[in-house]
Amino acid sequence: MFNQAAQELTTIRDVLRFAVSRFNEAGLFFGHGTDNAHDEAVYLILHTLNLPLDMLAPYLDAKLLEAEKEEVLAVIERRAVEHIPAAYLTHQAWQGEFDFYVDERVIVPRSFIYELLGDGLRPWIEYDELVHNALDLCTGSGCLAIQMAHHYPDAQIDAVDVSLDALEVAGINIEDYGLEERIQLIHTDLFEGLEGTYDLIVSNPPYVDAESVGALPEEYLHEPELALGSGADGLDATRQILLNAAKFLNPKGVLLVEIGHNRDVLEAAYPELPFTWLETSGGDGFVFLLTREQLLGEE
């Protein structure tokens, strides 16, 4: 099929149609940036051809050079056959207006937390200038640390990960955004060895339960398992965060954690904690907020 496509397809429109059919035939999972075969194909084609990602229409009937067609079809075939997430093929992932370098040393950024930084944390953080020190636990690619630096211009940020490989990727992104003086990368397991206190702690920790890890679509198998699974019920990392966070929060400090689909399990495990569930594009059951006072049972 690949050789036939290389011979008969001539325009971007042709290649796009072929890619959508190929992706549907392959039964791909979409959830690392796009949610359907068409958008995934558009992204891969435009990126590979170095065209603006938001300008498909003017180029649909443009004819491809043989070398261009060969390169685009090779990317399409890798996506279809190997089920590699598109972000790993392009080494680029987007969150809002921010783009980040990614490879298979880190999960593809998809946390809802970035939607909440700034206005989404009012009234708990009334003014962005009140955040002077922030912590990103399980930083991965560094995407949340970088976005915190953007929203909180006076903040110094510690970005922590247990994976040295992940910290290398985070370092690439921090350098790309010129934030080396504001974001400190720390190799440790959650709070271990940390000495500072923070106005804001955010974390998108591993939260997939053991049964679900075994049933994940093939695309997720390209991501580091260390960043996905978290014990039998998916809460091992979250338990450690809840146990220790208060010691590292300033008096008016706020904790923000994403936990996937584990809201019911978490609330059953911690009936005494008054979780505030924040609305995101995914719904109101994925990210919780707790203040230091709530963690200490003082509110």
Curated annotation (Swiss-Prot):
The organism's place on the tree of life at top rank: Bacteria
EC number assigned by the record: 2.1.1.298
Pfam families according to UniProt: MTS
A GO term from the CC aspect: cytosol
UniProt-listed GO biological process terms: methylation
Record field: catalytic activity: L-glutaminyl-[ribosomal protein uL3] + S-adenosyl-L-methionine = N(5)-methyl-L-glutaminyl-[ribosomal protein uL3] + S-adenosyl-L-homocysteine + H(+)
Signal sequence, renumbered to the chain: none
Enzyme class, broadest EC rank: transferase
InterPro entries noted in UniProt: DNA_methylase_N6_adenine_CS, HemK-like, Ribosome_uL3_MTase, SAM-dependent_MTases_sf, Small_mtfrase_dom
Keyword NAD assigned: no
Example GO molecular function: nucleic acid binding
Family: Belongs to the protein N5-glutamine methyltransferase family. PrmB subfamily.
PANTHER family, sorted: 50S RIBOSOMAL PROTEIN L3 GLUTAMINE METHYLTRANSFERASE, RIBOSOMAL PROTEIN UL3 GLUTAMINE METHYLTRANSFERASE
Free-text function comment from the UniProt entry: Methylates large ribosomal subunit protein uL3 on a specific glutamine residue.
Annotated protein name in UniProt: Ribosomal protein uL3 glutamine methyltransferase
Source organism: Neisseria gonorrhoeae (strain ATCC 700825 / FA 1090)
